[in-house]
Amino acid sequence: MKVDPNKEKALAAVLSQIEKQFGKGSIMKLGEDRSMDVETISTGSLSLDVALGAGGLPMGRIVEIYGPESSGKTTLTLEVIAAAQREGKTCAFIDAEHALDPIYAKKLGVDIDNLLCSQPDTGEQALEICDALTRSGAVDVIIVDSVAALTPKAEIEGEIGDSHMGLAARMMSQAMRKLAGNLKQSNTLLIFINQIRMKIGVMFGNPETTTGGNALKFYASVRLDIRRTGAIKEGDEVVGNETRVKVVKNKVAAPFKQAEFQILYGQGINRTGELVDLGVAHKLIEKAGAWYSYKGDKIGQGRANAGKYLTENPAIAAEIDKTLRELLLSNPSAMSSSSSDDENSEGNVDFETGEVF
């Protein structure tokens, strides 16, 4: 296609002027001087990494994780921190709920000695700390736990019973406008944990909503809905949760996929159990009766023993993990557990926020 040389000269002149005024990189062609692949951090769950499409949570973006109480929201974010720290990244945890347990975090593999932690007094303080950490360019992952606990200063200084309609939503809206651009420039991943509330008077559709207004729903590149679907028992003792995560919004890959995995109390995500299940499903691990074998060698009788073998032999576990990632990320449809959620297809979906109505 022939381009008018006068237009080319005019474009070159204006681009030069913009770069001189606002700095190099302030405007560029989409495919120029940058990797088209999105840098990601693992969630700690292979099936969830595959459901996300890109292999994990995207850097330089805002992510929202929401769900009912005790569904595994904080555990999932601590797994992300542990994965980031293993890659040498710097992480910060804004504990607005004042409920972070350092002993539990350490059990999940978090290096608590190098984890930055803040327990802010007000919502504005929490978001200002986020903004300062982001602009520094020195922090790679920031977790905010949770949006519901980000209380505006006016509400804290007021009396119980005072009306403060829309204060939190206005605060979050302003923060999103400030943070979004800075996060992209510093390539920082910002994860907001959120709680669920019920809309009053909803007769049809989903009555659930999240706190903090609508701004976060629009600015988030990824929104994850995490739910506890059952209990894991050893005899009569409950030792963990069966967990399902739905990707209700995804701007970096196809949305509406889901992943199922186990969260064990005091241990976090059951990675080796996932490897055994996915390995068998994709014929990397052979199953004959109750026995599991890998490359002709028996690795255990029963799923628990096979998982224990992989825990004791991390090199073999890493080899299986690498092979599965290459297989599933190149062909995500091969994984049945991360198929599109049938429930979402039954209702109307807001493609901007991922909400079903």
UniProtKB/Swiss-Prot annotation:
Q: Which UniProt keywords apply?
A: ATP-binding, Cytoplasm, DNA damage, DNA recombination, DNA repair, DNA-binding, Nucleotide-binding, SOS response
What PROSITE patterns would the database entry show? Answer: RECA_1, RECA_2, RECA_3
Q: Name one GO molecular function term.
A: damaged DNA binding
Lineage, top-rank taxon, reads Bacteria
Q: Which GO terms describe its biological process?
A: DNA recombination; DNA repair; SOS response
Q: Which GO terms describe its cellular component?
A: cytosol
Question: DNA damage as a keyword?
Answer: yes
Q: Where is this region: Disordered?
A: 332-357
Q: Where in the cell is it found?
A: Cytoplasm
**InterPro entries per the UniProt record, alphabetical:** AAA+_ATPase, DNA_recomb/repair_RecA, DNA_recomb/repair_RecA_CS, P-loop_NTPase, RecA-like_C, RecA-like_N, RecA_ATP-bd, RecA_C_sf
**Residues that hold ATP according to the record:** G67, P68, E69, S70, S71, G72, K73, T74
Keyword Cell inner membrane assigned to the entry: answer is: no
What's this protein's function? Answer: Can catalyze the hydrolysis of ATP in the presence of single-stranded DNA, the ATP-dependent uptake of single-stranded DNA by duplex DNA, and the ATP-dependent hybridization of homologous single-stranded DNAs. It interacts with LexA causing its activation and leading to its autocatalytic cleavage.
Family, according to the entry, reads as follows: Belongs to the RecA family.
The record's listing under NCBIfam families reads: tigrfam_recA (TIGR02012)
Q: Which PANTHER family does the record cross-reference, listed alphabetically?
A: MITOCHONDRIAL DNA REPAIR PROTEIN RECA HOMOLOG-RELATED, RECA
- Show the HAMAP family listed in the entry: RecA
Protein name as annotated: Protein RecA
